[in-house]
Swiss-Prot record:
InterPro entries: Rbsml_bL25/Gln-tRNA_synth_N (IPR020056), Ribosomal_bL25/Gln-tRNA_synth (IPR011035), Ribosomal_bL25_short (IPR020055), Ribosomal_L25_dom (IPR029751), Ribosomal_uL5_bac-type (IPR020930). GO terms for biological process: translation. It comes from Mannheimia succiniciproducens (strain KCTC 0769BP / MBEL55E). Keywords: Ribonucleoprotein, Ribosomal protein, RNA-binding, rRNA-binding. NCBIfam families: PRK05943.1. Belongs to the bacterial ribosomal protein bL25 family. This is Large ribosomal subunit protein bL25. CDD domains: Ribosomal_L25_TL5_CTC (cd00495). One of its GO terms (molecular function) is structural constituent of ribosome. GO terms for cellular component: cytosolic large ribosomal subunit. Part of the 50S ribosomal subunit; part of the 5S rRNA/L5/L18/L25 subcomplex. Contacts the 5S rRNA. Binds to the 5S rRNA independently of L5 and L18. Gene3D superfamilies: Ribosomal Protein L25, Chain P.
Amino acid sequence: MAFKFNAEVRSAQGKGASRRLRHNGQIPAIVYGGNEDAVSIVLNHDELNNAQAHDSFYSEVITLVINGKEVAVKVQAMQRHPFKPKLVHIDFKRA
């Protein structure tokens, strides 16, 4: 199963900005690795939450469309809420 998500670069950093994103149904994430700088992004929470239910989400290469540019990544780390079925943050590593 091929996964493809639309993402936007986020400029606001910090705890307050991340909480506002989560309250609006989005999830903060970061893309790093390769020869490029790390990029902070924001994704739709519901799309990612549904996709992460599949086992292949963790092993396959995922395509992120960041401002019109496709980036191939793999999930490096994922933080979940302690008792709610919500994602808190995701780290992606360029494939």
